UniProtKB/Swiss-Prot annotation:
Superkingdom of origin organism: Bacteria
Protein name as annotated: Na(+)-translocating NADH-quinone reductase subunit A
Keywords assigned by UniProt, alphabetized: Ion transport, NAD, Sodium, Sodium transport, Translocase, Transport, Ubiquinone
Reaction equations catalysed: a ubiquinone + n Na(+)(in) + NADH + H(+) = a ubiquinol + n Na(+)(out) + NAD(+)
Its job: NQR complex catalyzes the reduction of ubiquinone-1 to ubiquinol by two successive reactions, coupled with the transport of Na(+) ions from the cytoplasm to the periplasm. NqrA to NqrE are probably involved in the second step, the conversion of ubisemiquinone to ubiquinol.
InterPro entries the record matches: NqrA, NQRA_2nd, NqrA_C_domain, NQRA_N
Naturally occurring in which organism (per UniProt): Shewanella amazonensis (strain ATCC BAA-1098 / SB2B)
Keyword Ion transport tagged: yes
Lineage: Bacteria, Pseudomonadati, Pseudomonadota, Gammaproteobacteria, Alteromonadales
E.C. number: 7.2.1.1
Single Gene Ontology BP annotation: sodium ion transport
Assembly description: Composed of six subunits; NqrA, NqrB, NqrC, NqrD, NqrE and NqrF.
Length: 444
């Protein structure tokens, strides 16, 4: 077992009850284009078209052969575009149960499938997009093969669902998904889970991770087991996508059901709910939000995105909806007050005297932008074998060569989310990292 000691379990109120409930009926779902890094769509549908679940709605001209399919059957009601005609979202109003039928196999046949059969079924169904690469965190090319595949069956994000609870009702599907994934690599499938979690491990090498966040991030697992580099590409996939892959191959139908957490300080009743990929967050949170100004976030409070306008839908890789108070008020001489109701990793406030207390955190950054101050905060929350202060300095200054030499290629934005949270200078290091990775990929 690998125990993560450097990191932070965010003491934020509003954790969900670990019991799965049925969510509200969803009337609209959306595929969000900007979630797929570097993707440039070739549209196969237009507003007003009727689509079946699993039907191709666009393909990626930058990554030929990668297909994106409809999350539900119904009518395309919106195709939203932003600056420079970047695809923001394709919205479908759900109607009927029409679905494309894909190849299906008996569970006993999965071990004898060829890599080509597996690859084709994943591509045609759109489930290929569940896979992501390191470096760069992109959907892999359809003819690529990884050095290994990491299955993330642990989640240490604040307010996350317990993966073992979700998998418990789908153990056969999960095991079948692992068998299928093993066909895509000549290396190993690495199943990463919490210590003692009852999770099937068919055809996979098991690694247990304990300790504080980011013990549950794929970047942490990859770093300690099979580090990614310019010459070594690995893939990772979430546990609920593994379940969906297993169901795809045994039923021939695309399963877009997901279990997510609706939680946060402004959640009326934080809990786990069953819903659909791409579900309307407005519908999901009806009756779930406390009074006042609230920011709805798709994903974790550490690395989610504001869900408004054309982006007001559950993200493809998100398993949480976080509800936070929209705090726009400035606190007079707040820096000098005792702060018994505030959290600080540097013990700047009296709140540290209650180590088990949960705080009603808001969207406030606690001050304006300022210079990057290296006072040891980054080292406290970075468990990877890198020099965080030096790396972050190079990212901010635009020194791409220096950042790559210090390990930037191993990372994704979520791996630097804690550094952003504890930064006195209020820097969003994830955006700097993405700029660095884009430069490396563009210039080779």
């Amino acid at each position: 077992m690998i125990t993560i000691k450097k990191g932070l379990d965010l003491p934020i109120a509003g954790g969900p009850e670990q019991v799965i409930h049925d969510g509200p009926a969803i009337k609209h779902v959306a595929t969000l284009g900007e979630e797929y890094i570097g993707m440039r769509p070739t549209m196969r549908i237009k507003v007003g078209d009727k689509v079946a679940k699993g039907q191709v709605i666009f393909e990626d001209k930058k990554n030929p052969g990668v297909k994106y399919t409809a999350l539900a059957s119904g009518t395309v009601t919106e195709i939203n575009r932003g600056a420079k005609r970047v695809l923001q979202s394709v919205v479908i109003e759900i109607e009927g149960n029409d679905a494309v039928a894909f190849d299906k196999f008996d569970a006993s046949q999965l071990d004898s499938l060829s890599a080509e059969q597996v690859r084709n079924n994943l591509i045609e169904s759109g489930m290929w997009t569940a896979l992501r690469t390191r470096p760069f965190s992109k959907v892999p090319a359809v003819d690529a093969s990884p050095a290994g595949i990491f299955v993330t069956a642990i989640d240490t994000n604040p307010h996350a669902a317990n993966p073992a609870l979700v998998i418990a009702g789908h153990k056969d599907d999960f095991a079948n998904g692992l068998k299928v994934l093993a066909k895509l690599t000549e290396g190993k499938v690495y199943l990463c889970k919490a210590p003692g979690a009852d999770i099937p491990a068919a055809n996979a090498e098991v690694h247990e991770f304990g300790g504080v966040h980011p013990a549950g991030l794929p970047g942490t697992h990859i770093h300690f087991i099979l580090p990614a580099s310019v010459t070594r590409t690995v893939w990772h996939v979430g546990y609920q996508d593994v379940i969906a892959i297993g169901q795809l191959f045994t039923t021939g139908e695309l399963n877009n059901n997901r279990v997510i957490a609706i939680a946060g300080p402004k959640a009326v009743k934080p809990r786990l709910v069953r819903t659909l990929l791409g579900a309307s967050i407005e519908t999901l949170t009806t009756g779930e939000v406390a009074e006042g100004k609230v920011r709805k976030v798709s994903g974790s409070v550490l690395h989610g995105r504001t869900a408004t306008g054309p982006h007001a839908y559950l993200g493809r890789y998100h398993l949480q909806v976080s509800l936070l108070e929209e705090d726009t008020e400035k606190e007079f001489i707040g820096w000098i007050l005792p702060g018994s109701n505030k959290f600080s990793i540097t013990r700047a406030f009296l709140g540290h005297l209650s180590p088990r207390r949960l705080f009603n955190m808001t969207t406030s950054t606690g001050g304006s932008d300022r210079a990057m101050v290296p006072i040891g905060n980054y080292e406290r929350v970075m468990p990877l074998d890198i020099l965080p202060t030096m790396l972050l300095r190079d990212l901010v200054s635009g020194d791409v060569d220096g950042a790559v030499a210090l390990g930037a290629l191993e990372l994704d934005e979520e791996d630097l989310a804690l550094c952003t949270f504890v930064c006195p200078g209020k820097y969003d290091y994830g955006s700097y990292l993405r700029g660095c990775l884009d430069t490396v990929e563009r210039e080779g």
